[in-house]
Amino acid sequence: MKTNNLFYFMKLSLSLSYGVCMFLLMSSCVEQKKTAIEQSLKKNDYYVAAYVWPSCHDDRPLGHEMLWADGIGEWEVIKKGNPRFEGHYQPKQPLWGYELDNDPEVVGKWIDVATDHGVNVFIYDWYWYDEKPYLESALNDGFLKAKNNEKMQFYVMWANHDVKKNYWNYHKYGDDTSILWDAKVDWENYKIIVERVIRQYFHKPNYFKIDGNPVFAIFSIEKLKQSFNNSDEDTRKALDYFRDEVKKAGFPDLHLQLIFGGGYFLSEQSGKNITTSIEKMGFNSVTFYNMGGRVEDYIVYGTNSINIREQWDKLLNLPFFPCVSVGWDDTPRFPAYGMKDVVHYNNTPESFATLLSKAKIFADNHPEQPKLITINAWNEWVEGSYLLPDMKYGFGYLEAVKDVIIDGKYDR
């Protein structure tokens, strides 16, 4: 009997030991995964955020019915790009082929290559037209269903701009510049938008936050004001409503970021008007979608952008985050455009790396704010500004980000 008891206790002890070991092993794996993610983000202290233009999938009903009937989204237009001058690289050809941006396996590949090269935030362009979401599948089905999405932080930019009929597909609409979709919203739709983004995105553990506050970016200050009687005060009330709903959802506050479509120099008076309006409406930070002021020479383009950045930084009484563009070539959208409309001289990964290093210095010189740098863009194929590998430079632009952000090759 004693022998049986002894055997029983030995068996029990072994089982318990095994169970404890397995628990510790699993806990260790979870902690290692969590630590790996944290180390990936803390490796350099920089938040390198690339804009994602989510047009390359079969969006239904709006995209399919009104713009791209082939079932591949804007690839339909990108493939039709044609050279306008000698040496003009058109059509743009992705190294990985014409993959759909709402495929979680595709986006999973994006996430791996982005984080390996120093890009750790995606800013998804997000739309609301005709009382419904537009192009949302890229984020909902592509990014959020990618098995490794926790490696990458993300936030949403409400791209609240109008769309002319021939802007996104002149092959279909020709010279018809009438408005296809007006981005202005009424209070009812605005409340739906607020509820939707809080519910769908803000509670995700990898949603990008500043001081614990979810970051929500807005593209057009003009269309925002048009939605609320063209009044700074009424717009402030709408944004305060958003803040209140975010607080009810359990967050300390909302970080509202205003994004201007492109950088440009301001006169003294226009600078005062913009800064006064921004402050009245209660925005928390400002950045650009692209560098703006495009010229043929990328070095001149970049030098202008640095001067514009310095002016805006001095004018604003709130954080301004630097933006670096990969390039610019939107000729696939505009048949009349030619050489003078394309950034093509000195438009190389090395030139981009130099400009990105200047943005890094700017971030270092502003220790009072997060080291956030925005990049135009991750996949703006139709505008010729993308980090994703192509048939011309391969992984050149991603390697440039790694050289600057992770390896510090451009540090002085």
For every predicted segment, state its role.
Residues 2-17:
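Bacterial N-terminal signal peptides that target proteins for export
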Residues 27-28:
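C-terminal motif of bacterial Sec signal peptides marking the signal peptidase cleavage site
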Residues 37-412:
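Glycan-processing catalytic domains of CAZymes
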